[in-house]
Amino acid sequence: MFESAEVGHSIDKDTYEKAVIELREALLEAQFELKQQARFPVIILINGIEGAGKGETVKLLNEWMDPRLIEVQSFLRPSDEELERPPQWRFWRRLPPKGRTGIFFGNWYSQMLYARVEGHIKEAKLDQAIDAAERFERMLCDEGALLFKFWFHLSKKQLKERLKALEKDPQHSWKLSPLDWKQSEVYDRFVHYGERVLRRTSRDYAPWYVVEGADERYRALTVGRILLEGLQAALATKERAKRQPHAAPLVSSLDNRGLLDSLDLGQYLDKDAYKEQLAAEQARLAGLIRDKRFRQHSLVAVFEGNDAAGKGGAIRRVTDALDPRQYHIVPIAAPTEEERAQPYLWRFWRHIPARRQFTIFDRSWYGRVLVERIEGFCAPADWLRAYGEINDFEEQLSEYGIIVVKFWLAIDKQTQMERFKEREKTPYKRYKITEEDWRNRDKWDQYVDAVGDMVDRTSTEIAPWTLVEANDKRFARVKVLRTINDAIEAAYKKDK
């Protein structure tokens, strides 16, 4: 896989200087067209052998192009803030928006490679990391990102010659770093595992480009031309090709009986039983959150449901048991301009809680397979692939010790109508009823189908859905609290 990058490529000075003039002009033009169209972001991953010119090439790209439209990100040791969250969080929060370019040093490939080379992880863990990287990149590209992956290469002989030359040169010996010497010691293992990573993750939508790094002029021109040709091709394509679904469209149940039809919405708690059970579950929650075992966890609660199903009231009964410093409520509405410039999961990743914290999502990433599906805000291919992307997202949260609980609060049409009318009559509740609520009511059956599909495809052992019978608000509130408490206790038992 690296043979063509060990043959001794070189470019003479005159050829280089002539080519650079045209290349710089074309790159700048493409960069400003990217900004003008603002249809997709560009993500450049920098990997390969230490000393093969990675830093020098990126520095040159910043000189050739407008650095105001480029964000260079270096992922070295995780910060304390990053260590408190799943590993992917640090990458998600630094993704470039549409129209801009992000250059990632020390990205997900660097971390998995060094971890395996240094023996911190086993073969199976490396394979898991490779699979996760491939899924992440597939999603980024499906969301429109243009991804370039560069491997800067030197043969073992070229690396040793470079180290010796720099060591003897008083003016340039400062360029040597401990990583350069370390690379020389582990070269064979690094290249072995590097080849494995490239072989497994070079795809048509995100191929690897192996660049020989010995000659700086050849290296710079090669990278510049790859970027230019890729950018020009993407900019000239008015609509990026989207992956088409391979399965038949989802259909309604043949007997017209859906998952929500199986709920007993007549379940009820009288006032005295409600007060007693509510107080008991709130006290239980307060104790579980204060337990020292919660230091290894955080909590994410997702609230979805029919309009007027009582999500707000249920959330308030949960937070009544907590210190305001422990929780954060994230209300989800239509995405902002900033959020539309990113993959749809970006605005949820940025709110993932640190350890010992509790985040409540009032509406969530499930909008992709509910309102966006029903209103046609995204293509069928997009919401069909979202089921797998959401499962992957929640699995990453769970693997890091985040307890994920998900609620669908269900009411019948008659109860919803009664609550709508009550809201219209009550001045301090009138703000809760909108034209959108009435439009959603007209699409009741479509939501029934969408909710059934959502639960069937995303209710997993690590993040199951809880369907809450919410015609009676008291019953619903207690069930929500009890479910959260049961989930925390189950997580504590697994810790043992």
UniProtKB/Swiss-Prot annotation:
GO terms for molecular function: identical protein binding; kinase activity; polyphosphate:AMP phosphotransferase activity. InterPro entries: P-loop_NTPase (IPR027417), PolyP_AMP_Tfrase (IPR022489), PPK2-related (IPR022488). The keyword Ribonucleoprotein does not apply. Its cofactor is Mg(2+). It catalyses: [phosphate](n) + ADP = [phosphate](n+1) + AMP. Uses inorganic polyphosphate (polyP) as a donor to convert AMP to ADP. Can also convert GMP to GDP, with lower efficiency. Cannot dephosphorylate ADP in the presence of polyP. It comes from the Bacteria. This is Polyphosphate:AMP phosphotransferase. Changing D362A: Loss of activity. One of its GO terms (biological process) is polyphosphate metabolic process. Belongs to the polyphosphate kinase 2 (PPK2) family. Class II subfamily. Changing Y447A: Strong decrease in activity. It is an enzyme of class 2 (transferase). Its EC number is 2.7.4.33. Has low activity with Co(2+) or Ni(2+). Changing K311A: Almost loss of activity. Keywords: Kinase, Magnesium, Repeat, Transferase. Contains 2 fused PPK2 domains. The N-terminal domain seems to be catalytically inactive and might be responsible for the protein dimerization. Residues 11-234 are annotated as: PPK2 1.
